[in-house]
Amino acid sequence: MSRILVDTSIWIDYFEDKDSYTIIDRLVIDNLICTNDLILAELVPFFHLQEKDELVEALMALQKYEIRIDWPQLIHMQISNLKHGINGVGVPDLIILENVLVNDLILFTKDKHFMLMKDVFDFKMFDYKELKRR
């Protein structure tokens, strides 16, 4: 199975209520979760200020996929979004999507922009709801 890039939206929900995403624990144990510097930059400062050092260490220990930004590609992606009526997608989301595409990762998110972009770009999303039904 490909690595699963857990988006900030899922991590925030998980840390607020671990029972809401128990699958995260299993994915960590199975060593399937990965991250990147953008997601870490969104999460780590908040936990650092709360002095949750063990949590910061655990996040930093996850396999990390380097972000190599291809700016012309991001511009092309945003143009494709706009042509398909998908407005308001921020550059950070485009960078995350590019990281997913380049490294053939599975994205675990609840962000509506990614749900919309799924119809435009060929990438895999982790379907936690489907997994819960089994």
What are these regions (language model features)?
Residues 1-3, 97, 102-134:
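Acidic, PIN/NYN-like endoribonuclease modules and their adjacent C-terminal/linker elements
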Residues 11-12, 40-43, 114-115:
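A generic structural signal for short hydrophobic patches within well-formed alpha-helices
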Residues 29-31, 58-62, 84, 103, ...:
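Structured helix-beta-strand junction loops
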Residues 34, 65, 124-126:
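General small-molecule cofactor/ligand-binding pocket signal
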Residues 50-54, 82-83, 124-127:
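Short, hinge-like loop/turn segments at secondary-structure boundaries
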Residues 65-110:
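Active-site neighborhoods of divalent-metal-dependent phosphate/nucleic-acid chemistry enzymes
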